């Protein structure tokens, strides 16, 4: 179990399963990045998880989070000064936060976390499936998740394939049941059209749709959808 529900053993104090990826990503850092600052763009919950883990372990971190999503950055204790924050102004969305983080990455003082392409991020999130399977005793028939980038669903699928290779928990593949928050549904629209490529989405309309949804963390306009190994 993930999130925060101590009665059933879930003790992630950020209340987000994104802690699973923050620990694995930070644990995989090596000397190559010594004296450099890790950069993470986020719509909110990933930033909260990385801020906690980096603060607790004194890992220099630069977060890029849309100004409208800053209320997602709550913590049970003050953060260490090694964690810094930049934000695109009011009216911007997650994609704008990514572009702002890319500007910082033009300096050799910073390095990118990597997002869905970082195997440590996917393997970290995959632990939710590994934990479920070892408790249930078999690979589930269905996997449900709300998605912004779809990285969690990709991670779940990769875990499923490894469990099949392991052989102790069955040989079937879960049906991934992923959802988005209307009216911001770019992956749903592409899937419905059976298109590997994301459909055209006007930037201004996308920002308006993001303002309307409740789940701001699901607002990735450029998800790893059509790439090889992506959600499609």
Where are these predicted regions, by residue range?
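PLP-dependent amino-acid enzyme catalytic core
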Residues: 1-232
């Amino acid at each position: 179990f993930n999130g925060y529900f101590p009665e059933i053993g879930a003790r992630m104090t950020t209340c987000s399963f994104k802690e699973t990826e923050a620990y694995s990503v930070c644990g995989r850092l090596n000397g190559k990045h010594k004296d450099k600052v890790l950069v993470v763009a986020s719509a909110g919950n990933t930033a909260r998880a990385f801020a906690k883990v980096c603060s607790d372990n004194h890992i220099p971190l630069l977060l890029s989070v849309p100004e409208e999503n800053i209320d997602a950055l709550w913590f049970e204790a003050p953060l260490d000064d090694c964690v810094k924050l930049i934000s695109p102004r009011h009216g911007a969305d997650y994609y704008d936060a990514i572009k702002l983080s890319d500007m910082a990455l033009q300096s050799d003082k910073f390095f990118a976390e990597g997002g869905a392409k970082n195997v440590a991020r996917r393997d970290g999130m995959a632990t939710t499936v590994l934990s479920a399977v070892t408790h249930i005793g078999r690979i589930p028939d269905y996997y449900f998740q709300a998605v912004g980038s779809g990285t969690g669903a990709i991670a779940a699928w990769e875990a499923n394939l490894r469990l099949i290779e392991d052989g102790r928990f069955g040989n079937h593949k879960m049906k991934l049941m992923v959802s988005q928050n209307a009216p911001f549904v770019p992956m749903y629209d592409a899937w419905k059209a059976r298109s590997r490529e994301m459909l055209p989405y006007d930037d201004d309309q996308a920002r308006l749709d993001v303002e309307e949804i409740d789940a701001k963390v699901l607002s990735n306009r450029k998800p790893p959808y059509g790439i090889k190994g992506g959600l499609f």
